[in-house]
Structure formats: structure tokens, C-alpha cells
Amino acid sequence: MASMMFTDCSSTTTSRLIHLNRSSGTFLLRQCVGQLRLQTTASGRGCCIRSSSSPISSISADTKSEGGAIVIDGKAVAKKIRDEITIEVSRMKESIGVIPGLAVILVGDRKDSATYVRNKKKACDSVGIKSFEVRLAEDSSEEEVLKSVSGFNDDPSVHGILVQLPLPSHMDEQNILNAVSIEKDVDGFHPLNIGRLAMRGREPLFVPCTPKGCIELLHRYNIEIKGKRAVVIGRSNIVGMPAALLLQREDATVSIIHSRTKNPEEITREADIIISAVGQPNMVRGSWIKPGAVLIDVGINPVEDPSAARGYRLVGDICYEEASKVASAITPVPGGVGPMTIAMLLSNTLTSAKRIHNFQ
């Protein structure tokens, strides 16, 4: 039995995974990306690729593969989504004179958090979304943060609010996140959004960005979810649990593996789809994987590498070298889920602006 130590693995607004770490939005246009139909043969080892008849055949033809597995290119998909968002932002501005706005609150001077905020601002600029930012000192009071949240809640030019995590230890993180207006909770962390996600017949206003990005990758590559066995490794509120809920909503049969799970490799070997989000480098080995399975790797883990310029390289939770020889499709690390997280944040912000202004 494998020994497992799970951590909170998030590639969204948190930076808990590593120090360097890194809706229900309905804006899910798929016609511009190569839709790959992945079909396992009777033996489960083969992978047949058919490109759709849409204008994406050129992307399908350029699809990369490694060790027999299709490489699910998160960078390419995220770029397509940003292009779609750019068009919609421009259309909204021209039609009703409204530009979607995203506000970020950063507390403290963590370099990794500052990098994430800078990347989000750059992403907003690239699609025409306005960005607002408040920076507070590490020793700021919780009341000061709540005041900033309240100000953005009341600002009609702000359609999405994001509190950069982690917050200083003297602050009640949940209390601050709960203060964000649910209509502007583009991170999807508000308990009411998660509660709606968990209930049949209810729709959350927003879905957390990283799990939403995972499912969107499956959609964009036309990978069937309905009726499939899916395993989510990790049960964090940020990635694992909402990812499991999303898969369940799409009629997959879902199992969750966590630090108390016995014989995780046996459970994982039954899965057609695996989403791993635990922050343990190369934990999932090739022997854990059912031939022909589809693998979505959320983990971003630094491992020492003297040959690398920075002295380390980034790897996922899944041993890529082994898994790519068994799976039918796999996300790389980096370049898989990471780019999708910010793309989904932009998508959620656009969705919020459209909803608030009743723009179709």
C-alpha cells in the first residue's frame, strides 16, 4: 500500500501548495478548439482520434502525444477561451457601454502571492477586463480587509472580487471569504455557491476556477464523462471536493481518495477519469492507472534538479513518464490545468458582469 501525505493542492487564488506556487458560469463556447473523441478499444489500450467537422481540425491535426497518450494542452485551450472572452468583452462594451471589472485584495508581501496577482492583472488586461487592486500590510487588521471587501461589494464597476490566499494567520479566512457578495464571488468559494453545487436541481452562481478548468478540459477534448468511473485524489474545499461534485453532476460514478483511504491504488485502477490534486510529486504511478484512462493533474510540485537553472523543476502528482505510456490522454505539468485556472477566473468575471447587467 502506498504511503500518502495529502496537502491542500490549489492552483487558483491560493498559494498553499508550494511557496513558489502558483462558475456556474455558462460561458463555455467549445467550437473553436480541437474536439478529440477518445475511444478505448475493447482491450482498453487503444486510442482512436477523430477530429470534429468544425474549423478546429487544424488543431486536432497538431495534437501532441507522448508515450501513446494524447497531451491535453491547457495552454492552447486557455488561449482559445481568452480569445472568446475578448470578443464578448468587446461586444458588451459596444452594446451597453459596460466593461467587466475584477478586484483583487492582497494582504502582506509574499512574493508568490504578489506574482499571482500580477499574472491575474496581466490576464485581465489581455482580454479587456478592468482590474482593481488593494494592497494591505501584513499587520493590517481583519476589519481593514473587510472594509475593502465591503467597498468592492458596493462598487458597480466591480463584477468579481478575489481575496488572495493565504491570509495572515491572525485573520479569520472564512469570515473574510464569506463577506464577499455571492453575486461577485468569482472564486466560487462562498458556502452558498458550494452548497448549491452539491444539491441536485440547484445551480451555483460560480464554480471554483480550478475544478471548473479541469472539467472544461474534458469538454474541450470531447471526453465523455457520463457513465464513466471517475476518481478524485484529494478532498480540499478548493479543488478536490468541487471537482468530485462537478463530475457527479455530469453523471460520472465518483470515488474520492484521501489520506485515510485504504489501498488507493486499487481504487484508482478502476477509474476511466482521474483528477489528482494533493500536492505530492509523482505519487500516482503508472501501475495505478487503468489502460486508456484520462488523467488530469492539478499538482504543481517543485523537486530538486541541479541541472535546472533555478535548481528545481516542477512536476505533478502523477508520474508523467510512466502514466503517459498507459493513459489515453494526460495533462502536462506545467502547461495543463494551471493556465485554465486563470481562464476560468476571467470567464466567471464575464459571466458575473453579464448577469448583473442582464446582458445576453
Swiss-Prot record:
It catalyses: (6R)-5,10-methylene-5,6,7,8-tetrahydrofolate + NADP(+) = (6R)-5,10-methenyltetrahydrofolate + NADPH; (6R)-5,10-methenyltetrahydrofolate + H2O = (6R)-10-formyltetrahydrofolate + H(+). It is found in: Plastid, Chloroplast. One of its GO terms (molecular function) is methenyltetrahydrofolate cyclohydrolase activity. Pfam families: THF_DHG_CYH (PF00763), THF_DHG_CYH_C (PF02882). Pathway: One-carbon metabolism; tetrahydrofolate interconversion. Residues 1-51 form a transit peptide. The modification N-acetylserine is found at S52. One of its GO terms (cellular component) is chloroplast. Its EC number is 1.5.1.5, 3.5.4.9. Signal peptide: none annotated. One of its GO terms (biological process) is tetrahydrofolate interconversion. The keyword Oxidoreductase applies. Keywords: Acetylation, Chloroplast, Hydrolase, Multifunctional enzyme, NADP, One-carbon metabolism, Oxidoreductase, Photorespiration, Plastid, Transit peptide. It comes from the Eukaryota. Belongs to the tetrahydrofolate dehydrogenase/cyclohydrolase family. Homodimer. HAMAP family: THF_DHG_CYH. Catalyzes the oxidation of 5,10-methylenetetrahydrofolate to 5,10-methenyltetrahydrofolate and then the hydrolysis of 5,10-methenyltetrahydrofolate to 10-formyltetrahydrofolate. NCBIfam families: PRK14186.1 (NF010783). This is Bifunctional protein FolD 4, chloroplastic. It comes from Arabidopsis thaliana (Mouse-ear cress). The lineage of its organism: Eukaryota, Viridiplantae, Streptophyta, Embryophyta, Tracheophyta. The gene is FOLD4.
